[in-house]
Swiss-Prot record:
InterPro entries: ATP_synth_asu-like_sf, ATP_synth_asu_C, ATP_synth_asu_C_sf, ATP_synth_F1_a_nt-bd_dom, ATP_synth_F1_asu, ATPase_a/bsu_AS, ATPase_F1/V1/A1_a/bsu_N, ATPase_F1/V1/A1_a/bsu_N_sf. This is ATP synthase subunit alpha. The gene is atpA. Residues 115-137 are annotated as: Disordered. It comes from Geobacillus stearothermophilus (Bacillus stearothermophilus). Belongs to the ATPase alpha/beta chains family.
Length: 502
């Protein structure tokens, strides 16, 4: 077979005519310094603040500090494979996380990658982790209650959908338990819950996940975890990833609860990053924008107006105190951002008052707007009565010669403390809460010995399930108290069957 030169030249000419050159321009820089999870790169002149960049070994980073001659990049993954002189390129994208229904029931890291061993998350939708909070005209005032199932909270410091309520206290005072009970109580409430674990032990997160699974709460919960062994950038990003996942549902008109456990560790991680990129330290060595770190996160919690779909995002941030000092820097910052705080006190916790809520220092700035009518009626004076009891209790230790009125207040206060105690992971429906608090505030428990009050409560609930369904149904449907005569008769009828212990 002979090769014909004309055919070959015709083929070559055709290929030359069809050739199209595509020029790919990518903004590339060079790593000039690496260490402690931070890289400095030269040559990325047009990079945006917060933009994702990619290193030669496919590890991603985020531009944090834009300086005159170099860029400070936090590395979102293992940084041991990156070395000086390596190439780093812009992606043109800011940090995003996957969002959607597919995340429900999963445990993911702050980048949205699953860590529960159940395979990939099947979703194509993403949201940027930093997005503007809803504007003034896009919001409406908080008016729907978020029932926690915890009597002391629903009666004294009620939380509404769209509210930011800080849970503050020393370590080991039951902060996480309050959040878990609240999540468990959202079953059948049309609520998506997101639990963000920041700097927690892996074993603690595992326990939380198993508790949620045992109570069937993982069916409507997303767990975002950046454990203590993760690099500081992931601890810093975790709350923003959680709120971005929640916003997806909020803007679709659904109701979301996000728990940040806890923001003290996020602040410490951000302080670490800021010091590594040489930002000047301020009070307690935190950078100057530490307030903005938390305010821009918590302002994204809102109750949207009907025009925007009427969805809501409720935030329960945690802050850990040292020896009950709520006047430290991070606690005072977050107290000033949120719509109230629930203060858990270690003294109460160790004296077996659990949940260990200090009624005097806890407050909800939404208040009665986040309570049903029935609860407002029965719990109106409860806070003041409890505060007065704590004051009298201190004085009563010094003298036994007390007048009748003071003795009555002390007796009522002791019973109030007993009624507000609650077992772990046993949230109580609001209609039952209303009836036991009604019995307390109307004096029906005054002749019940203090040691029998909790047994009285348990047996009263069982009696209501059998004989008082019409009362419970009335509160459930109308949100108001039933006829007081019917209530009084029902409580008296139960008291006749209750046997006081000897």
């Amino acid at each position: 077979m002979s090769i014909r030169a004309e055919e070959i030249s015709a083929l070559i000419k055709q290929q030359i005519e069809n050739y199209e050159s595509q020029i790919q321009v990518s903004d590339v820089g060079t790593v000039i310094q690496i260490g402690d999870g931070i890289a400095r790169a030269h040559g990325l002149d047009n990079v945006m603040s917060g933009e994702l960049v990619e290193f030669a070994n496919a590890v991603m980073g985020m531009a944090l500090n834009l300086e005159e001659n170099n860029v400070g990049i936090v590395i979102l993954g293992p940084y041991t494979g990156i070395k000086e002189g390596d190439e780093v390129r812009r992606t043109g994208r800011i940090m995003e996380v996957p969002v959607g229904e597919a995340l429900i029931g999963r445990v993911v890291n702050p980048l949205g990658q699953p860590v529960d061993g159940l395979g990939p998350v099947e979703t194509t939708e993403t949201r940027p982790i930093e997005s503007p909070a809803p504007g003034v005209m896009d919001r409406r005032s908080v008016h729907e209650p978020l029932q926690t199932g915890i009597k002391a909270i629903d009666a004294l410091v009620p939380i509404g959908r769209g509210q930011r309520e800080l849970i503050i206290g020393d370590r080991q005072t039951g902060k996480t338990s309050v959040a878990i009970d609240t999540i468990i109580n959202q079953k059948d409430q049309n609520m998506i819950c997101i639990y963000v674990a920041i700097g927690q032990k892996e074993s603690t997160v595992r326990t939380v996940v198993e508790t949620l699974r045992k109570h069937g709460a993982l069916d409507y919960t997303i767990v975002v975890t950046a454990s203590a062994s993760q690099p500081a950038p992931l601890l810093f990003l975790a709350p923003y990833a959680g709120v971005a996942m929640g916003e997806y549902f909020m803007y679709k008109g659904q109701h979301v609860l996000v728990v940040y456990d806890d923001l003290s560790k996020q602040a410490a991680a951000y302080r670490e990053l800021s010091l590594f990129v040489r930002r000047p330290p301020g009070r307690e060595a935190y950078p100057g924008d530490i307030f903005y770190l938390h305010s821009r996160l918590l302002e994204r919690a809102a109750k949207l107006s009907d025009a925007k779909g009427g969805g809501s995002l409720t935030a329960l941030p945690f802050v850990e105190t040292q020896a009950g000092d709520i006047s430290a820097y991070i606690p005072t910052n977050v107290i000033s951002i949120t719509d109230g705080q629930i203060f858990l006190q270690s003294d109460l916790f160790f004296s077996r008052v659990r949940p260990a809520i200090n009624a005097g220092l806890s407050v909800s700035r939404v208040g009665g707007a986040a309570q049903i009518k029935a609860m407002k009626k029965v719990a109106g004076t409860l806070r003041l009565d409890l505060a007065a009891y704590r004051e009298l209790e201190a004085f009563a230790q010094f003298g036994s010669d007390l007048d009748k009125a003071t003795q009555a207040k002390l007796a009522r206060g002791a019973r109030t403390v007993e009624v507000l105690k609650q077992d772990l992971h046993q949230p109580i429906p609001v209609e039952k809460q209303v009836l036991i608090i009604y019995a307390l505030t109307r004096g029906f428990l005054d002749d019940i010995p203090v040691k029998d009050v909790r047994r009285f409560e348990k047996e009263f609930y069982l009696w209501l399930d059998q004989n008082g369904q019409h009362l419970l149904e009335h509160i459930r449907t109308t949100k108001d108290l039933p006829n007081e005569d019917d209530l009084n008769q029902a409580i008296e009828a139960f008291k006749k069957t209750f046997v006081v212990s000897q």
